[in-house]
């Protein structure tokens, strides 16, 4: 009888043992290079993540997806992603940017300020202690056109902005999966959409390829993007990360008059690209981590076949 009673107690205890959360004290994450976090930081928590990007383009994909050589171009860009937890489920992020570019012996006259974005994130479902319950969030953002985009004199590289303000929206997912060796794999998925923002008036040389004396307007297209990402925690110091993403932009049109009064009308796109971003993570502590890797555009249409090494530090306060 005692033996059967003990067996019954064991069966009753089994679900409790299975439900015991995993130990996360030696697990640290920076996040992959491109994905957004499906969970918001705790109320009062500040996360600061500056990035540095170096992009080099020697090839481009044409309208049929074939790769061709183009005039080499290089650019440096830096952004700072600053996120603050307003409540445990609601967070705000601001993303300022600067850049420097060069091609065919011409370059920017110094460092250019780019557009600045803000976004707000609401977490619909919070993760549990060991991350095995998925986190889901919705994001709404806005881009402020603060970077130069036209009246660039004779140097078209001096433009760092788009000239248009626009909204963007995203749905985010994140979940941990504990492997047989006791280490976690964190998976993310992001789906984003930016509707067509409207038109922007242009004068002179601009980031849209217009020349000196041009007067007219540009109408940038909409964007749809998606990615999946995975991070593997090797130990409390090291981790591996990978993004696989896709982005599609609809047509951008430019119309107006050149410096001699002749009508000008052009359309570019639509464009698309597929990219992969492998990276390595290193953590000094639970509040400071580094990630470095590169983004490779391996397929696309009417887009650059660029390679973009990048690095970032994540600081949690």
Each predicted region: which residue ranges?
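Residues on the lipid-exposed face of transmembrane beta-strands in outer-membrane beta-barrel proteins
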Residues: 48-50, 80-86, 118-124, 140, ...
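Outer-membrane beta-barrel biogenesis signature
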Residues: 18-59, 128-137
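Surface-exposed loop and membrane-interface regions of Gram-negative outer-membrane beta-barrel proteins
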Residues: 69-73, 86-87, 92-125, 250-252
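Surface-exposed strand-loop-strand hairpins of Gram-negative outer-membrane beta-barrel proteins
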Residues: 21-24, 53-78, 157-159
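Residues that define the transmembrane beta-barrel architecture of outer-membrane proteins
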Residues: 74-78, 109-118, 134, 161-167, ...
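Outer membrane beta-barrel transmembrane domains
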Residues: 55, 59-68, 202, 212-317
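Transmembrane beta-strands of outer-membrane beta-barrel pores
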Residues: 52-58, 68, 96-102, 124, ...
């Amino acid at each position: 009888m005692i033996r059967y009673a003990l067996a019954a107690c064991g069966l009753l205890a089994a679900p409790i043992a299975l439900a015991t959360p995993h130990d996360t004290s030696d697990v640290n994450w920076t996040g992959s290079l491109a994905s957004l976090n499906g969970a918001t930081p705790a109320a009062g928590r500040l996360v600061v993540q500056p990035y540095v990007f170096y992009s080099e383009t020697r090839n481009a994909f044409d309208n049929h997806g074939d790769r061709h050589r183009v005039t080499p171009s290089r650019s440096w860009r830096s952004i700072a992603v600053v996120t603050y937890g307003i409540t445990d489920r609601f967070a705000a992020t601001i993303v300022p940017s600067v850049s420097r570019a060069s091609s065919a012996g011409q370059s920017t006259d110094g460092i250019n300020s780019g557009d600045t974005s803000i976004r707000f994130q609401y977490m619909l479902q919070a993760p549990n202690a060991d991350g095995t319950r998925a986190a889901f969030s919705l994001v709404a953002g806005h881009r402020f056109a603060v970077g130069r985009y036209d009246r660039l004199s004779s140097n078209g590289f001096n433009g760092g902005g788009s000239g248009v303000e626009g909204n963007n929206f995203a749905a985010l997912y994140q979940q941990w999966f504990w492997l047989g060796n006791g280490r976690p794999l964190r998976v993310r998925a992001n789906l984003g959409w930016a509707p067509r923002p409207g038109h922007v008036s242009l004068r002179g040389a601009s980031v849209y390829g217009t020349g000196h004396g041009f007067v007219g307007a540009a109408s940038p297209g909409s964007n749809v993007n998606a990615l999946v990402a995975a991070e593997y925690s090797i130990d409390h110091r090291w981790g591996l990360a990978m993004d696989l993403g896709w982005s599609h932009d609809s047509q951008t049109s430019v119309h107006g008059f050149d410096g001699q009064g002749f009508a000008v009308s052009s359309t570019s796109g639509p464009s698309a690209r597929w990219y992969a971003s492998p990276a390595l993570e290193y953590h000094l502590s639970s509040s400071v981590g580094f990630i470095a890797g590169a983004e490779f555009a391996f397929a696309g249409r009417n887009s650059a076949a660029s390679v973009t090494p990048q690095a970032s530090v994540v600081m949690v306060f």
